Amino acid sequence: MAQHYKTIGLIGKPNHDGASATIQTLHKYLLANEYKVIVEVSVAQSLDIKKMKTGTLTDIGEQADLAIVIGGDGYMLGAARVLACFDIGVIGVNRGNLGFLTDLSPSEIIKPLEQILSGKSRSEQRFIIEAEVYRHGKLKSSNSAVNEAVLHAGKVASMIEFEVYIDGTFMFSQRSDGLIISTPTGSTAYSMSAGGPILTPNLNALSLVPMFPHTLTSRPIVVDGNSEIKLILANDNHENLQVSCDGHVILTVMPGDEVIIKKSECSIRLIHPLDHEYFNVLRNKLSWGNKLY
């Protein structure tokens, strides 16, 4: 088999029996076919493999040509945020629920993987976003998000008040439970559950989706993906405010703070099987109707 990739990184959810079994299968297969393999260190501890090379996500990003992530979309998001700034392809094996980002089935993995490893695959760039919190003009914290950045109160069902600016132009002020700023990748996640639009992955766009706004006229809006979105928190908000990045990373926000959300310079290079079709994924995952005839 011709080798399109030379070094493969294996990443999986630690202490997950299904993920561990898949990683052990892949590790054995890849070594037998003379690939170099790096196993992410946190999952390596739960594997029954005597000799293996291990490394952090950063090590895999720096040394590998392809990363195979075994888990659900949530674990894929965590790995992708780190790997986005490296020149590495990423493909997922679904060990979760819906699996919008994880193409391969663990029960039928070797045949499609052979095709991918020989270069018979599709490559797709997905942009990510950066969220930055400023206090009195100084950067206090920042992080990236593959799916969405969400401004919200720290406690459930608590309204907050803020202003929204697009490229420095005032758009609106709002009292609501928060605001979701979603990428096209995230448009089938939290944003969709909140009534936001589905954006096809090739769009250079961001959607702003209000969370339970205290008005009947507030609706989601789609803006250019190169826009800089600025949220200014009202001074009379309660102190317990947050920005969540993909639901994993929490940035603390105080009344009067400014939150800047914009496209990152990094992007994810997703690798898909040749027969991958985005609308087919939507149809299967969301139980849409098939062709009539």
Swiss-Prot record:
Location of the protein in the cell: Cytoplasm
GO CC entries: cytoplasm
InterPro entries per the UniProt record, alphabetical: ATP-NAD_kinase_N, ATP-NAD_kinase_PpnK-typ_C, NAD/diacylglycerol_kinase_sf, NADK
Protein's name according to its UniProt entry: NAD kinase
UniProt superkingdom: Bacteria
Keyword terms, alphabetized: ATP-binding, Cytoplasm, Kinase, NAD, NADP, Nucleotide-binding, Transferase
GO molecular function: ATP binding; metal ion binding; NAD binding; NAD+ kinase activity
Cofactor: a divalent metal cation
A Pfam family reported for this protein in Swiss-Prot or TrEMBL: NAD_kinase_C
Binding residue positions for NAD(+): D73, G74, N147, E148, R175, D177, T188, A189, Y190, S191, M192, S193
Keyword NAD: yes
